[in-house]
Amino acid sequence: GGKHKRKEVPRVFRYKKSIPVSYERQGYIYFTSLLYWELPKRTQEKILNLCIAAGKENYQALFEFVTTDAGAQAVCLRHHLSPSTLERAVRRYYEAFPRKI
């Protein structure tokens, strides 16, 4: 048969034990970040700055990962990043995210 290109399944929120932030906070950060494009300009700037601080030279990959439903594998391939590098950036981002943005 012909090869079918696997359609990216939208990501779902999953609690990550590796991130020392509560389930509720992780959910808040996850969904707030996904709503990036609907947030006020000032909040968008805060999120972008958090990505720059946490992702450093890989901030564009981190930004794409937290503000879209692109999967980790796709983001890593696109930005030539190892999964562990992205994981560390995501952990820093979650740890630095303010209580209320």
Where are these regions (language model features)?
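N-terminal interaction/assembly modules
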Residues: 1-53, 73-74, 79-80, 85, ...
